Amino acid sequence: MGKRKGARSGIYHVMSRGSGKQIIFEDNADRRHYTDVMRASFSADSGVTLIAWCLMDNHVHLLISGELADIAISMRLLSSSYAMYFNKRHARVGHLFQGRYKSVPIETDAQLAAVIRYIHQNPWKAGYSTSCDYPWSSYGEFLHCADDGAPATELLELFGGAEGFREFHAHLGGSQACTTEDAEFGSGHRAMPASVALDVARAALGGIEPGAVSSLPRAKRDASISRLGAAGLSVRQIERLTGVSKSTVARLLGH
């Protein structure tokens, strides 16, 4: 297991995704719970400060500052607490998150500004929204200084104030602004946004939550996969929604 690279600035872009690119937020109740646990995990006495964040359907982007050891403790608390909640609520078992979270050190103001924009533009690039004004990110906190937004207030000066912040975010940044390829976290543009795919899947399954498909008896699981394919979902979308491996989905759909 490789040793994490420390940042002189103490700031890191942290990314965590569902195991097998599985959906980790089924609805807004899940998202609210995650943000509650997130704020508790990065409380004042944790030694870790949350700067920016964004929740996608199958992964999370966080920009945080602190010592690596403190970050590891906070991330372990966040991931384990949320996974226990999610598994209980959705009657599933097994790992929710894929291995260790990824972290990229941030060293310069230019890199910091680019990463903040990258995090806030994730929903826009993925087709979840038509701008950065997305309810499950810190974009609004920067503008309104919500939730004791001292870090956001100070960082607005990096953009020349609120108007500069809006202008900087109004244009989609190129790949050079990204610390990790979009494709690695499934955040690229898709023909059917994940939120739409989730609704289609629920309708096709007739009351079975997509995340529960992987734990169904094999015959019922296979039939569910077939219904999802017939509903127009791609192999990759079915993999993410159900947690069933891509190879199994492809085999069942005859791809």
Protein language model features and the residues they cover:
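Short Gly/Ser/Thr- and Asp/Glu-enriched loop/turn motifs at secondary-structure junctions
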Residues: L55-H59
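Short Pro-Cys-Gly-centered "Cys-loop" motif that presents a nucleophilic cysteine in a tight turn
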Residues: M1-A52, S65-H255
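Short beta-strand motif characteristic of blades in beta-propeller domains
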Residues: V60-I64
